[in-house]
Amino acid sequence: MRSGIVGWGAYIPRYRINVNEIANLWGLESQVVKNLGLSEKAVPDVDEDSTTMAWESSKNALRRANIDPSQIGVVLFGSESKVYAVKPTATILIDALGVTNDSLGADMEFACRGASAALRLVGGMVEASKIKYGLVIGSDTAQSNPGDVLELSSAAASVSYIVGPENEAGAVIEAAVSYTSDTPDFWRRDGMPYPVHGEGFTGEPAYFDHILSAVNLLFRENGYKISDFDYFVFHQPNGKFPLQVARKLEISMDKVKDGLVSPYIGNPYNASALLGLAKVLDIAKPGQRILVAPFGSGAGSDAFSILVTDKILEKQKLAPTVNYYIERKVLVSYSTYAKTTGKYKVYE
């Protein structure tokens, strides 16, 4: 038995900040912003965090799956911005969503790829008949040091997937592979508030090498070629990197543009590529095939082949789309953004 996506859901905070405002405040050159291919980024409100956003996106996924949450046998939560350093978010979500306590809950960590690894694991549990349904969440209020280039892209969003049996799926997971190595491109040491980049490793040795290796491995193991896919979705640390991957693979931009989210909301880390996948599922038609390749620093990439079924059309209508959340926005100032994300420190 194959596994598939029975339900999917997204959530993006309403607040946005123009990345040019951040660049101007810190004296970053306009060319830096242009090179990133970004316009705005999503900012959490003062009462939003990776847990509350995960609840929102999971409720949308449950609407599309049209199942009782008590039927879910595992909840895996991928994030770089957990509310607690030591206390799982998955347990909070299990009780908040009404998932049975006779279930497995765990938080996944692999930079921006924790949720993607979770998708592979839950898919395997469904295929092995260990569970009927599993919930996978990628949710982040991404951290960045004020004035760092990373602050232009680090964003907030959440995406959730309910994985279940093939005969109930709006899209079937046909195949999946992973590619992993010890590449120090990005890290945050224990006790440090913000991550740092190993600049020489960020592009070619990390992002490009791992995504291209995972995609080529998927092709080799399954006999796929570019023309077999209608959509391609890659991890989106900025607006330019996924387009460069497409050019390296000689993929038409028409097959990439529908899955782009970072030019509009920035990079929400664990919700990046998987949010792009949700955006494609919102519009995909039966019989179309999607390749999605998330990436996580440190470093690793997964590549999935996903085949859309005729059940997709009914599910698309049952919850708000990614585009709905992208267009639902309120622009805020840097001072508001700094306040809601805790960049101001008050000492008494």
From Swiss-Prot:
<dbReference type="Pfam" id="PF08541">
    <property type="entry name" value="ACP_syn_III_C"/>
</dbReference>
<dbReference type="GO" id="GO:0003985">
    <property type="term" value="F:acetyl-CoA C-acetyltransferase activity"/>
</dbReference>
<keyword id="KW-0012">Acyltransferase</keyword>
<feature type="binding site">
    <location>
        <position position="240"/>
    </location>
    <ligand>
        <name>CoA</name>
    </ligand>
</feature>
<feature type="binding site">
    <location>
        <position position="202"/>
    </location>
    <ligand>
        <name>(3S)-3-hydroxy-3-methylglutaryl-CoA</name>
    </ligand>
</feature>
<feature type="binding site">
    <location>
        <position position="235"/>
    </location>
    <ligand>
        <name>(3S)-3-hydroxy-3-methylglutaryl-CoA</name>
    </ligand>
</feature>
<comment type="subunit">
    <text>Interacts with acetoacetyl-CoA thiolase that catalyzes the precedent step in the pathway and with a DUF35 protein. The acetoacetyl-CoA thiolase/HMG-CoA synthase complex channels the intermediate via a fused CoA-binding site, which allows for efficient coupling of the endergonic thiolase reaction with the exergonic HMGCS reaction.</text>
</comment>
<feature type="active site" description="Acyl-thioester intermediate">
    <location>
        <position position="112"/>
    </location>
</feature>
<dbReference type="InterPro" id="IPR013747">
    <property type="entry name" value="ACP_syn_III_C"/>
</dbReference>
<feature type="active site" description="Proton donor/acceptor">
    <location>
        <position position="235"/>
    </location>
</feature>
<feature type="binding site">
    <location>
        <position position="29"/>
    </location>
    <ligand>
        <name>(3S)-3-hydroxy-3-methylglutaryl-CoA</name>
    </ligand>
</feature>
<comment type="similarity">
    <text>Belongs to the thiolase-like superfamily. Archaeal HMG-CoA synthase family.</text>
</comment>
<dbReference type="InterPro" id="IPR004656">
    <property type="entry name" value="HMG_CoA_Synthase"/>
</dbReference>
<protein>
    <recommendedName>
        <fullName>Hydroxymethylglutaryl-CoA synthase</fullName>
        <ecNumber>2.3.3.10</ecNumber>
    </recommendedName>
</protein>
<dbReference type="InterPro" id="IPR013528">
    <property type="entry name" value="HMG_CoA_synth_N"/>
</dbReference>
<keyword id="KW-0808">Transferase</keyword>
<comment type="pathway">
    <text>Metabolic intermediate biosynthesis; (R)-mevalonate biosynthesis; (R)-mevalonate from acetyl-CoA: step 2/3.</text>
</comment>
<feature type="binding site">
    <location>
        <position position="267"/>
    </location>
    <ligand>
        <name>(3S)-3-hydroxy-3-methylglutaryl-CoA</name>
    </ligand>
</feature>
<dbReference type="GO" id="GO:0010142">
    <property type="term" value="P:farnesyl diphosphate biosynthetic process, mevalonate pathway"/>
</dbReference>
<feature type="binding site">
    <location>
        <position position="297"/>
    </location>
    <ligand>
        <name>(3S)-3-hydroxy-3-methylglutaryl-CoA</name>
    </ligand>
</feature>
<dbReference type="GO" id="GO:0019287">
    <property type="term" value="P:isopentenyl diphosphate biosynthetic process, mevalonate pathway"/>
</dbReference>
<feature type="binding site">
    <location>
        <position position="153"/>
    </location>
    <ligand>
        <name>(3S)-3-hydroxy-3-methylglutaryl-CoA</name>
    </ligand>
</feature>
<feature type="binding site">
    <location>
        <position position="112"/>
    </location>
    <ligand>
        <name>(3S)-3-hydroxy-3-methylglutaryl-CoA</name>
    </ligand>
</feature>
<dbReference type="InterPro" id="IPR016039">
    <property type="entry name" value="Thiolase-like"/>
</dbReference>
<dbReference type="GO" id="GO:0004421">
    <property type="term" value="F:hydroxymethylglutaryl-CoA synthase activity"/>
</dbReference>
<dbReference type="Pfam" id="PF01154">
    <property type="entry name" value="HMG_CoA_synt_N"/>
</dbReference>
<comment type="function">
    <text>Catalyzes the condensation of acetyl-CoA with acetoacetyl-CoA to form 3-hydroxy-3-methylglutaryl-CoA (HMG-CoA). Functions in the mevalonate (MVA) pathway leading to isopentenyl diphosphate (IPP), a key precursor for the biosynthesis of isoprenoid compounds that are building blocks of archaeal membrane lipids.</text>
</comment>
<feature type="active site" description="Proton donor/acceptor">
    <location>
        <position position="80"/>
    </location>
</feature>
<keyword id="KW-0414">Isoprene biosynthesis</keyword>
